Amino acid sequence: MSDPISFKVILVGDGATGKTTFVTRHITGEFRKQYISTIGVEIRQLPFYVAGQSCPNGREVLLNVHDTAGQEKFGGLRDGYYVDSDACLLFFDVTNRVTYKNVESWYRDVFRICPTRRDASTGEEKPLAIVLVGNKCDVKDREIRTQTVKFHRSKNIPYVEISAKDNFNYELPILSILRTLLNDPTIQFSQAPALLPADIGMDAATREQINKDLEAVNNVPLPDDD
């Protein structure tokens, strides 16, 4: 197995969109937690084990996940939270239209401070790896339907919907950023991430429809006037 490699991942988005829950439901390997009061952030180091064309014998990846610890409720985040990031998971709540409207502002803040990352293998400057994450897709009374989400297409970033209560698609945001950071679209988990048991169970038809809609919104280009 190749030597472990580590990356800094930041979680951004309005409060109560599920950022902290997303991290704490991952219980793979050793769980480390650190709080840095100067920038109001909790850091959790999560290990993932992957394999692909670039690492056929497998590789351990350590994600140092920086969580706001609720600081976004008090007038934004300090610039130090963003500095030297390799990847960003940008959250909104599909049951709250305001959190989706605020995605643009969060995206702007991130790229004002950290528009690029240093490639792990070449040392070149590359765009920050970012994934748009719509949480709480298990709720039937959604305010934001999958088909209406367009922000990711205007920025050419992936969009994933997840359910913290169901563990639905929970591995996809991490897998997406790992493929970008390791420059390898064939990357898969060689060991499935261990998650806390699901609180609910979405029916198979709902799961299938959401993933079908996600495939459509991730592959259909925006109209010229959007």
Curated annotation (Swiss-Prot):
A single Gene Ontology CC term: cytoplasm
Report residues binding GTP: 14-21, 70, 135-138, 163-165
Q: Which PROSITE patterns match?
A: RAN
Answer yes or no on keyword Oxidoreductase: no
Biological process GO terms, please? protein import into nucleus; ribosomal subunit export from nucleus
Where does it reside? Nucleus
* Region feature (Switch-II): 70-86
Q: Which SUPFAM superfamilies match?
A: P-loop containing nucleoside triphosphate hydrolases
Annotated SMART domains: RAB, RAN, RAS, RHO
Q: Name one GO molecular function term.
A: GTP binding
Q: Where is the Small GTPase Ran-type domain?
A: 3-184
- Return the InterPro entries for the record: P-loop_NTPase, Ran_GTPase, Small_GTP-bd, Small_GTPase
The primary site where this protein sits is: nucleus
Q: Which Pfam families match?
A: Ras
Annotated region described as Switch-I, given as residue ranges: 33-41
Summary of the function given for this chain in its UniProt record: GTP-binding protein involved in nucleocytoplasmic transport. Required for the import of protein into the nucleus and also for RNA export. Involved in chromatin condensation and control of cell cycle.
Q: Which family does it belong to?
A: Belongs to the small GTPase superfamily. Ran family.
UniProt subunit comment? Found in a nuclear export complex with RanGTP, exportin and pre-miRNA.
UniProt protein name: GTP-binding nuclear protein Ran
> In which organism is this protein found?
Giardia intestinalis (Giardia lamblia)
